[in-house]
Amino acid sequence: MKFRIEKDSLGNVKVPEKALWGAQTQRAVDNFPISGIKMDFPFTKSFVSSLGLIKDAAAKANLKLKLISSKKSKAISKAAKEVWQEKHHNEFPIDVFQTGSGTSSNMNANEVIANLATKYSKVKISPNDDVNMSQSSNDVIPTAIKVSSHMDLTKKLYPALDLSLIHI
């Protein structure tokens, strides 16, 4: 396997050459292999999709507030839409059990979306400064849990139930 070198505040880290994630995601993969169950596991699809929805909404809100350029916002939205449409689900190698407030999952989404958005816009999109603008893992992750729960209830559980048997 070929690698590229990514840099962050902790220094250099080897990332698979074709991976859309960056240094912080790779560090989480390397340092926290807790369960072996990755974010690309089938039951996490709605969670990863909800991260894309949140990043899309944030990019549009930041544009409306004139905090980000139209070019960057559109590129982030395009990339985020691909994430919520499950086109890059294999780019989420983080273990489902992770430290803290889900920072690793949030950064994984930020890095994937930033790399896609950079490719689309030909302008450098920062995972922290652009994709994660006006957000915190403490807000993004609880929101993603709620959105993905709603998605799974409405798309999977409710259709599987025969609601005609319930008499209220």
Positions of PLM-derived features:
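Conserved, well-structured ligand/cofactor-binding cores
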Residues: 1-166
